[in-house]
């Protein structure tokens, strides 16, 4: 490849609306151009990276026995209505009507369509297992698209769907895909971690997320450094405390706390540790009889885990109560709420840590007052107890093999055990060995192809630009001739190196644009090509050229006769 026949368009400064490193660098490197909110053109440099990501994904999916197909981006609403996701997905599902007023969805995933294929094509257990996959454009109508391609509205995704005859078969398919994902991310050359996760809106019984580790990641990854335990924050269990609850030592007292509405303010005013305070979170569950009010109690230095809260029996699809609902149920505005002297019946759920507390402080359901010396059993009934909080560093690992630590990650893949969630609702069945009708057991497996680009950059960059892992770099090597248009010797040697690397199967580009050295070097460091060879008259007089890896602090002088072998050795070809 010659740079003069390629398209390179770099910027010295990132656009003002670029917020995170990957967005800034992709815009500056000319990888993407913004077309609209959350919608981007993928320019030639960016598309080359996407194609390399796709090729690795495709090779490993084929190796794992999956079969590629392609499903429509526009899908009939009737299929989504069969599973209930037409209504459940909410506004992030882009809906449209054709000229005949028929409803359609612009796919964010394709569970319904692939299940429709399976129910029409698979009749017998002899046709199972099967795993279909596609690499296809998806659309999610994000309320606030941001961070470039990391949270865009249109994106490319690999989604796969397995169909098995029983739960044991599903487990094998799931493990097969899990192993394939490990190989994929290892081949990408990225530091990653697979973590236990919640299934969310997809539904099903079990799942893992694959996260690229990056300090700028928006997701918290919980792991135990002395074991294999890893989970995302939503799924990480906060274990019950081992110690028994201490006996009361204080009397219940209603204490004046003027205008102290936050737990931190109350703790400071009363001179007690923050962890002796309990914060009250009021939820509402809408029923046919009206809104049912729930009070969740969390230690003041902890945070509510909404996914865990939604799994409390009776709290699925909860919402946060309005201020009017709060005043009506507690007789007090927010800031002074607690589980004692409530105005109306309220279901109280305490986090495991709160249920283990004694002599604690909480709101008195009266403006400017809090209770101190509160104790379960003596001052109020024992609560419903559940794991409601996010774990924190230092908590005991759920596998009992150490304590937890937390790092940041960017989710780029997800595997789910769906079970019969879709096959039963869409009547996707087969006949087993005994001639009996059975629902197919399903799994689904996604990789955010375009999101990989942003995640890789967030993990691999410096002050000069992107540092691509070799496997997904737009080019493996760039040959930079200084004076290509002025020196026959430089041109001849640069062309020779370029040709020999091409013949060896190296993905190489020669910069024949005639740019000044500073501009040329800055462009390729920004774009992030991992290996660079510089050819110049001064070096050639000594029989040398310069080699420098993108992460190297200094260039290495290499004999002209050895440079191709040296570069091939660096990239393993």
Curated annotation (Swiss-Prot):
Signal peptide: none
Domain notes: Consists of three domains: the N-terminal catalytic domain, the editing domain and the C-terminal anticodon-binding domain.
EC number in record: 6.1.1.15
One cellular-component annotation, GO: cytosol
Primary enzyme class: ligase
Stored InterPro entries: aa-tRNA-synt_IIb, aa-tRNA-synth_II, aa-tRNA-synth_II/BPL/LPL, Anticodon-bd, Anticodon-bd_dom_sf, Pro-tRNA-ligase_IIa, Pro-tRNA-synth_IIa_bac-type, Pro-tRNA-Synthase_IIa_type1
Keyword Cytoplasm belongs to the record: yes
Organism: Cupriavidus pinatubonensis (strain JMP 134 / LMG 1197)
Task performed by this protein: Catalyzes the attachment of proline to tRNA(Pro) in a two-step reaction: proline is first activated by ATP to form Pro-AMP and then transferred to the acceptor end of tRNA(Pro). As ProRS can inadvertently accommodate and process non-cognate amino acids such as alanine and cysteine, to avoid such errors it has two additional distinct editing activities against alanine. One activity is designated as 'pretransfer' editing and involves the tRNA(Pro)-independent hydrolysis of activated Ala-AMP.
UniProt-recorded Gene Ontology molecular function terms: aminoacyl-tRNA deacylase activity; ATP binding; proline-tRNA ligase activity
Family named by the database record: Belongs to the class-II aminoacyl-tRNA synthetase family. ProS type 1 subfamily.
Subunit comment: Homodimer.
Keyword list, A-Z: Aminoacyl-tRNA synthetase, ATP-binding, Cytoplasm, Ligase, Nucleotide-binding, Protein biosynthesis
Catalyzed reactions per annotation: tRNA(Pro) + L-proline + ATP = L-prolyl-tRNA(Pro) + AMP + diphosphate
Localization in the cell: Cytoplasm
One protein family per Pfam: tRNA-synt_2b
GO aspect biological process, one term: prolyl-tRNA aminoacylation
Protein's name in the database: Proline--tRNA ligase
